[in-house]
Amino acid sequence: SAPDSAIERVRAASHCCAWSIALEAFGRSRGRGAPIGYATRTRRRVAGLEIWGAGMAQKMKAAVVHEFGKPLVIEEVAVPEVPPGQVLVKVVASGVCHTDLHAAEGDWPVKPALPFIPGHEGVGHVARVGAGVKFLKEGDRVGVPWLHTTCGHCEHCMGGWETLCDSQQMTGYTVNGGYADYVLADPAYVGRLPDALEFAPAAPLLCAGVTVYKGLKVLDCKPGDWVAVSGVGGLGHMAVQYAKAMGFHVIAVDVADDKLALAKTLGAELTLNAATQDVVAEVQRHIRGAHGVLVTAVSRAAFTQALGMLHKRGTMSLVGIPPGSFELPIFDVVLNAKTVRGSIVGTRLDLLEALQFGAEGKVASHYSTDKIENINTIFDAMRAGKIDGRVVLQM
């Protein structure tokens, strides 16, 4: 089938990258990457691309967080010196994620060390290769995702759940990220971009794309099953497309009619407005419950609603992180054998597969482009909930 072909193609190149986040790991992995200032190099040309060779010092533009809750400062800092085992990536485009806003606000339990450069959806080409790097070369097209590196030898890393590693380092949080002209990366954790995928469309796949794709995978649904996507925003509109490409019948749930109309054009067969309809009753009436529900909405009410939408033996996957907690009706869960799962971004293999769906035209983010100089205005719009889809910075 088409979904199988996409996955099999990427598994043939499974040394490429992905990443993820566990909030619990924030307190255990606070090592920093290189500081903001570095020694730098002169430019030369390879295959029509500007890269860096040995020579005089150079500067790069970056958006820097100096104080939590204050505007980012657009300034010139030194281009990083490349240590052994790492690569320097020339950033062409960088997606803006709500996690970047949380990092800049410092409103998560463990905060980044100041100052730092946010951004974990940077895409570009390898500008310089550190000593000992064997499988990447200058000019290679890559993405630098959230998961900067892990220990590689704990039970989670060895068991295919590297996103749960207690020693993980995170791009744009514990190490400097992609809101800059250049960013350092671990070559084992970058995502190799398929040739058919342009830079700007690839950027949102590094976080939003792989997050919803992994969330759908852990539902353990099969082609032909009914899957509901709760929340059709920056993540949800991509989830509808991934679900359709994976062979599922898709239900879209939101509180905004315009987002539901978009979901319909993206392949949703049933759309429901949670503000005006009894979503649980409608899903049970139409299909006797969904086999899986992916919750991207940052809403505790959506979590409870998702459980009610499930078919017997159904699974709900949670990727949204609203504050607080939600009640779990034990009687319903036990008697109907329902499963509740959290899902944390995705592994390197998950990212590889997510990018391939994009390369084959099965998934495309709805995004607008902007300049790094406008990052504070973008964050203001994000706080106000005025951003549709995603924003990609053109560097």
Predicted regions located by residue number:
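Cysteine-centered motifs
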Residues: 16-17
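Short, Lys/Arg-enriched N-terminal segments with co-localized hydrophobic residues
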Residues: 35-55
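Short N-terminal strand-loop motif that marks the start
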Residues: 50-123, 185, 394
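C-terminal hydrophobic helical "lid"/dimerization subdomain
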Residues: 52, 57-58, 257, 304-308, ...
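Glycine-rich beta-strand-centered segment in the early N-terminal region that forms part
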Residues: 80-94, 107-155, 189, 194-200
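NAD(P)H dinucleotide-binding glycine-rich loop of Rossmann-like/cofactor-binding domains
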Residues: 111, 149-230, 265
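Mid-domain Rossmann-like dinucleotide-binding core that forms the NAD(H)/NADP(H) cofactor-binding site
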Residues: 142, 195-282
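Glycine-rich cofactor phosphate-binding loops and adjacent beta1-alpha1 units
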Residues: 219, 251, 255-257, 261-339
